Each structure stands twice: as C-alpha cells, then as structure tokens.
From Swiss-Prot:
GO terms for cellular component: ribonucleoprotein complex; ribosome. The keyword Ribonucleoprotein applies. One of its GO terms (biological process) is translation. One of its GO terms (molecular function) is structural constituent of ribosome. This is Small ribosomal subunit protein bS21B. HAMAP family: Ribosomal_bS21. Keywords: Ribonucleoprotein, Ribosomal protein. Disulfide bonds: none annotated. The lineage of its organism: Bacteria, Pseudomonadati, Pseudomonadota, Alphaproteobacteria, Hyphomicrobiales. The keyword Ribosomal protein applies. Belongs to the bacterial ribosomal protein bS21 family.
Length: 71
C-alpha cells in the first residue's frame, strides 16, 4: 500500500494511510488473525455476518419503499 507525502506533511500522509487501511479492511483482518479461530467458529461467524447483511439490506429496502420509518 502506498501513500504520497506532500510538502513533508507526515501527519496528513498517516491519516490517508489509516483511511485506506480502514477501507480495505486491514485492521479488521489483523484483529481476526490475532488468535486462531476454529473452522466451526469461523463458519458460525460468517453465517451470522451474512444474516446481519441480509437484514440490513431488507431494512434499507423497506425504508426506501416507505414501509418502515427511518430512525
């Protein structure tokens, strides 16, 4: 991953790097790889994440169609 440093502004470059890493999901990946996750736990986690995604998408779709009031 590469970030340009303009005018020796290291702080701005660090912020840009952190933003890129956040978008790419690197922080989440590092956190997940911190400890070993059993395959059964991984399947359960991924299934729960998929259910959450589907529910979120359905909720957004319902809000867009006016069936549910926005929070």
């Amino acid at each position: 991953m590469q970030v340009l440093v303009r005018d020796n502004n290291v702080d701005q470059a660090l912020r840009a790097l952190k933003k890129k890493m956040q978008r790419e999901g690197i922080f989440r990946e590092m956190k997940m790889r911190d400890y070993y996750e059993k395959p059964s736990q991984k399947r359960a986690r991924e299934k729960a994440e998929a259910v959450r995604r589907v529910r979120k998408l359905a909720r957004k779709r319902a809000q867009r169609e006016g069936l549910v009031a926005a929070r």
